[in-house]
Design a protein with these regions (language model features):
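Structured, charged N-terminal subsegments at the starts of enzyme catalytic cores
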Residues: 1-14
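Activation/maturation switch segments at domain boundaries
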Residues: 17-18, 24, 28-168
Length: 168
């Protein structure tokens, strides 16, 4: 479906009907596979351009997995890229991505859109920020450590509920 430009929603609906699975299971599979092909295409494109390294970018929110937090900002040789090891997706629903490292430096992303963890207000911040820098600056510094821990717990509870949701 991706190669034909088919919308994700259409692929999800077709998979739900064809395989007789719940919509949540179909959505998880389609989104995870889309992430796989997107990142593999990026790796191949980087290789064709002579780019030898890439940087791992975790999604900047409290729902990001521990493994993606740990990998965020790390730089890997392009010829060692392995899905599930150092290349997203690392797990189902993975929202992490990669970016090229050019001439020994990280290619600057112009900016990355993120949401305030309390208000949900959307804003753009510098593109080369790591997860830890984002967390310290936009969660802990802004709301305090106690509130940060409370927000983390809430995000994990939400994530667990979403993961355990039964398909109809």
């Amino acid at each position: 479906g991706l190669l034909n430009g088919k919308p994700l929603k259409k692929m999800i609906n077709e998979l739900t009907e064809t395989m007789e699975v719940g919509e949540s299971a179909a959505r998880r599979l389609v989104r995870t596979e889309a992430a796989y092909y997107t990142n593999m295409a990026a790796v191949e494109g980087y290789k064709e351009c002579g780019i030898e390294k890439y940087r791992y970018y975790a999604k900047l929110d409290l729902k990001v997995s521990n493994i993606c937090r740990e990998l965020d900002g790390k730089i890997f040789p392009i010829n060692e890229a392995q899905t599930g090891i150092n290349l997203p997706p690392m797990h189902p629903w993975c929202r992490s991505s990669i970016g090229p490292v050019i001439d020994g430096g990280v290619a600057q992303r112009i900016g990355v859109r993120t949401r305030d963890v309390v208000t949900g207000e959307s804003h753009v911040i510098k593109g080369d920020i790591t997860y830890k820098e984002w967390y310290d600056r936009f969660v802990v510094d802004k709301y305090g450590e106690d509130k940060a821990k409370e927000l983390e717990k809430k995000a994990k509870t939400y994530k667990k509920k979403k993961t355990n949701k039964k398909d109809n």
